Amino acid sequence: MDFLNMSYQLIVAYLIQLGIYIGALAVIFFNNIVYAAISLALVLSLIALLYLFFDADFLAVTQILIYVGAINVLILFAIMLISLPKSSTFIFYFTKKSQISAFACISLFVLLVKIILQTPWSTQSSYILLNENNKLDQIGIYLLSNFLLPFELISLLLLIALIGAVSIARYQNTEETE
């Protein structure tokens, strides 16, 4: 009976992953950028569902609040702030710059995979995984003590990106009106 229950769970996990893959491909291949952003929201929501499936409630709620609720809304806001041409066709020309960019991206991906495979992952925070009662408490303590500086630097980087996007959009709008 447990085997049957486990096989249902495995099927559900594979279906969620399939939905993530299909949604990610939709983000890439949609011609309309608003549809791509909505597809991204679907992918991020399915990732949160996968977190729930693996009993990571805090990560699932954080995924929904931060990525689906804030980042995706920010992306949609930026899309609507910057007036794009109403072109429905997308033509990709494979130029020398795109070849260099593709080579750099593939090289970076291979390097990251190599680093990930060679890294000896420590079990320093196994206490968080073993102690079910204080999971959120321990994450909060680590976030506000050991990882406070990276957390604040990421929030500062997001603020700078938002200010830069708004200033670029305003600069382009003032050029169009003149």
UniProtKB/Swiss-Prot annotation:
Membrane topology, record value: Multi-pass membrane protein
Pfam family, one: Oxidored_q3
Subcellular localization: Plastid, Chloroplast thylakoid membrane
Keywords tagged on the record: Chloroplast, Membrane, NAD, NADP, Plastid, Plastoquinone, Quinone, Thylakoid, Translocase, Transmembrane, Transmembrane helix, Transport
GO cellular component: chloroplast thylakoid membrane
Catalytic activity: a plastoquinone + NADH + (n+1) H(+)(in) = a plastoquinol + NAD(+) + n H(+)(out); a plastoquinone + NADPH + (n+1) H(+)(in) = a plastoquinol + NADP(+) + n H(+)(out)
First-listed, main subcellular location of the protein, grouped into a coarse class: plastid
EC number(s) given by UniProt: 7.1.1.-
Keyword Metal-binding (UniProt): no
Record GO terms (molecular function): NADH dehydrogenase (ubiquinone) activity; quinone binding
Keyword set includes Thylakoid: yes
Membrane-spanning intervals of the chain: 10-30, 33-53, 64-84, 100-120, 148-168
Self-association state and partner proteins as the record states: NDH is composed of at least 16 different subunits, 5 of which are encoded in the nucleus.
Entry similarity comment: Belongs to the complex I subunit 6 family.
Function: NDH shuttles electrons from NAD(P)H:plastoquinone, via FMN and iron-sulfur (Fe-S) centers, to quinones in the photosynthetic chain and possibly in a chloroplast respiratory chain. The immediate electron acceptor for the enzyme in this species is believed to be plastoquinone. Couples the redox reaction to proton translocation, and thus conserves the redox energy in a proton gradient.
Protein name listed in UniProt: NAD(P)H-quinone oxidoreductase subunit 6, chloroplastic
